[in-house]
From Swiss-Prot:
Its main location: membrane. Residues 28-167 are periplasmic. It comes from the Bacteria. This is Intermembrane phospholipid transport system binding protein MlaD. Residues 1-6 are cytoplasmic. GO terms for biological process: intermembrane phospholipid transfer. InterPro entries: ABC_MlaD, Mce/MlaD, MlaD_Phospholipid_Transporter.
Length: 167
């Protein structure tokens, strides 16, 4: 009887450790920093095309993650994608004239937003909660690039043929 209780205790402990490890790995994979919220401020930007950008996509400066996409909506007036970005509070010295562009990690990787710092000449305001970044560059969609390449090559083939027939 005593041996059975000891055996059940160790099996239960092992099971709890396994469940804890799975929860830990799940949070790491989901890129969740824990249950405590990091202090951040939110800025918005409007793009012509966001491609496959998703909520929780990283905001990076030089490859370093400084924030995440918190929401993606459609602007009611212009019908363009409006992206809300939560920037970690420790990065509060970003000039308002900075620019955003949507990039892709690798050829077919996840999309992220790259922030290029603007200049700070003393009179330039810094981003704060509710600011809007005006200078944006939309995502380059792979299908569009392939279409342009194919269309461009057909056009040049057609021009070459017409030039050779004129001679």
């Amino acid at each position: 009887m005593r041996q059975t209780i000891k055996y059940e205790f160790w099996v239960g402990l092992f099971l709890l450790l396994g469940i804890g490890a799975l929860v830990f790995l799940g949070l790491r994979v989901a890129n969740v920093q824990g249950f405590a919220e990091t202090k951040s401020y939110t800025v918005t930007a409007t793009f012509d095309n966001i491609g496959g950008l998703k909520v929780r996509a990283p905001l990076k400066i030089g490859g370093v993650v400084i924030g995440r996409v918190s929401a993606i909506t459609l602007d009611e007036k212009s019908y363009l994608p409006k992206v809300s970005i939560a920037i970690n509070q420790e990065y509060n010295e970003i000039p308002e004239n900075s620019s955003l562009s949507i990039k892709t990690s690798g050829l077919l990787g996840e999309q992220y937003i790259a922030l290029t710092m603007g200049f700070d000449d003393g009179d330039t305001a810094m981003l704060k909660n509710g600011s809007q970044i005006q200078d944006t560059t939309s995502a380059m969609v792979l299908e569009d690039l392939i279409g342009q390449f194919l269309y461009g090559s057909k056009k040049s083939d057609g021009n070459e043929k017409s030039e050779s027939t004129e001679q």
